[in-house]
Amino acid sequence: MKVTSFILIILFGTLLNAQNRQRPVSVELGKFFNEDGKRMLYGGKKDYQHFDVSNLSLEEDQFHYGLGREAFPALLEPEFTSIQKADKQWDDDDRFLVAKSGNDVKAYSIKDLTRHEIVNDELNGKPIMATYCILADLGAIYTRTYGDKVFTFALSGYTYYDPEVWDGLDGFVFWDRETESLWWPLIGKAVSGKMKGAKLHIYDETKWEDTTWSTVKSKYPNAKVLISGQDFERPTSWRKYEDVSDVKGL
């Protein structure tokens, strides 16, 4: 049994390495470049969309893709419907993330999160985000408040892997609109920008779960369910935090 398990681990690692080699490498695509003494990472067609990654703590040659930071519609003002209306759309075995606080319950289908990847939301008045990475098959609920500052997250258009982390799984790289720092959820922290080193905070794990539509209906009949197919006009400007020294260690 131990030998079989060892062989399976080796085969799994070999498969992941092969998959990573097949994905487009960002450096080879010219996504990293120098400008005005800074190391930059392509973020979109507009000059203001590029990321300053001069203090990046990750390896450039382990980044994949480079679709642009607004390629995925990471929701800013999500809309919801009732269990009764949503029940017409979902099958009992459809997968959902559910978060609760007091009487406030939100349900996010994995199918919708696959499209959005991030949903910036509030739960009982507190800023949270629901996230899902299809490559790593990982869903989670995070808080978005650091001290007195609220952060808003989106997808950078890149994935990243490290052979020493999660057996080399390729995972999405986030960015925040307030400081344009990059965050890698597989290690749970910011990896460049003003917030480098700051930790992603998982929402109280006793108050959210990865479950099915059948369970959502039976346990949370008053839950608000994310409406499918939402999109929005991507913002061209956003509030910026110039000084985060008082919150990045929180």
What positions do the PLM features span?
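Mid-to-C-terminal functional-domain signal that highlights helix-capping/loop sites
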Residues: Q19-L250
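Sec-dependent signal peptide recognition
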Residues: K2-I9
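Hydrophobic h-region of N-terminal signal peptides that target proteins for export
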Residues: I9-A18
